[in-house]
Amino acid sequence: MNTSEELWLCLYFPLLPVEVFCRHDNSPVVVLNRQRVSFLNQPARDIGIMQGSSMSTAYTISDHVVSFERDENKELKRLEHLAQWTYQFTPSVSLTPPQSLLLEIGGCLKLFQGLTNLKQTIGDQLTALGYTVAM
């Protein structure tokens, strides 16, 4: 691949609305929008809570559910923080709110010994920081 060609990698954070409140928590966590579950972590799914459920339904399933009201400002600030973090991989980063970043990686593939290694490095580091990411 010619390193002068643009190549964009999208980092999608499907659980960012949950992870802005807690990233390393094994408790069932839900994020509400108008008293409905909009986002939930895997422990919440595992006990049977579903997206779209009312908060009262979630509490009926388990009184150990931790709930937060969605905070889009907090999500944007975290996305901006993550964008700053990705500058270690490329100088070209674009925010695509509400839950994604675009990284221009065409010029840095050689440095990271290819796309597979770059994706693995980014994924491993984000996982260690407590984020769920899809690329």
Predicted regions and their residues:
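Residues that scaffold, gate, or flank divalent-cation-dependent active/transport sites
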Residues: 1-102, 107-109, 113-124, 128, ...
